[in-house]
């Protein structure tokens, strides 16, 4: 009965912006809802996984879990990024942890060795086994695409075309030079709440006068209505007084406009939710990105990335002033986590 009521409540979320209700509470605490989300949102289609530039050198890797599947993102000798299953083909042992740079991937359990493109290289005591050598022992590859500097992974063997999935994403973000922006700081933390809670809060202005009254509220004007999206994302633009990348008391430290800005990008910030698990904001001088990967129905793993244009990074005072931008990111987040 409770889930029949939930389905009815969920249908009330499908109206216009003036009439639609918020997601029902069960969407944030139910293990059954979480299982459905995994099966239909994370195991199917494309899942955004942050910025590609963080893996810039051959052998750079990063590990993550996508819907319970352990994954390695790694740059191969051909300078292409690959998404590999982070489990040995022998007994399924986890191969790598965290992030770093490597010339090969060695299983810690039986020392099976793989090249950084995922192909099998060697294993102890297999020289006499013709049957073994004839098998495909390469690591499983997942589909991986890059658009505007963002990475998208799919666990499906034959996912739909990424550009169809994105729709008019590039068009609506064309006023900013997003593709060339570089990640200068990144951290990951675990939080004790549902992944959608985090993404909900980042994408609404309603709480600003109450939660961010003395930090960033005065920077932001009431945003425009959301733009018409033809892809798997929602986005809206709002004017700002100064930059959304700094606290209202620190606006005098602003880097100034990035090169190549036009239109809306000169006037404020665009906030975008890339379904299902990534959101970001782009102002005239910086971009900040959050990934909220679900661990279970009551826990999520959040990664924050702060990005700047290369010309900004080249400024002599970048190291000092960028810390003031990072302070704004952390202050606003700490205020949100109440």
Predicted regions: what they are:
Residues 74-75, 80, 86, 145, ...:
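C-terminal catalytic domain of Rieske-type non-heme iron oxygenases
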């Amino acid at each position: 009965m409770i889930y029949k009521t939930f389905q009815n409540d969920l249908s009330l979320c499908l109206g216009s912006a003036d009439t639609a209700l918020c997601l029902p509470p069960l969407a944030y605490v139910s293990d059954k809802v979480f299982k459905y989300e995994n099966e239909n949102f994370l195991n199917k289609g494309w899942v955004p996984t942050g910025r590609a530039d963080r893996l810039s050198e051959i052998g750079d890797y990063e590990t993550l879990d996508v819907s319970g599947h352990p994954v390695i993102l790694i740059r191969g000798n051909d300078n292409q990024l690959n998404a590999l299953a982070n489990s040995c083909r022998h007994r399924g042992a986890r191969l790598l942890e965290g992030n770093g740079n490597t010339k090969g991937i060695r299983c810690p359990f039986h020392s099976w060795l793989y090249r950084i493109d995922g192909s099998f290289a060697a294993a102890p005591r297999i020289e006499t086994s013709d049957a073994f050598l004839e098998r495909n022992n390469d690591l499983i590859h997942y589909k991986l695409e890059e658009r505007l500097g963002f990475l998208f992974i799919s666990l499906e063997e034959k996912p739909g075309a990424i550009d169809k999935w994105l729709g008019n994403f590039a068009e609506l973000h064309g006023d900013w030079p997003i593709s060339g922006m570089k990640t200068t700081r990144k951290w990951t933390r675990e939080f004790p709440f549902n992944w959608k809670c985090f993404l909900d809060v980042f994408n609404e202005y309603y709480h600003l006068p109450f939660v961010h009254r003395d930090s960033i509220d005065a920077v932001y004007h009431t945003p425009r209505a959301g733009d018409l999206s033809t892809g798997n994302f929602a986005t809206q633009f709002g004017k700002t007084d100064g930059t959304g990348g700094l606290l209202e008391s620190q606006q005098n430290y602003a880097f100034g406009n990035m090169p190549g800005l036009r239109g809306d990008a000169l006037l404020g910030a665009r906030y975008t939710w890339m379904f299902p698990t990534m959101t970001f904001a782009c102002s005239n001088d910086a971009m900040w990105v959050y990934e909220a990967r679900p661990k279970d129905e009551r826990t999520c793993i959040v990664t924050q990335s702060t990005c700047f244009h290369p010309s900004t990074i080249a400024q002599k005072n970048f190291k000092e002033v960028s810390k003031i931008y990072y302070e704004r990111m952390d202050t606003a987040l700490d205020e949100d986590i109440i």
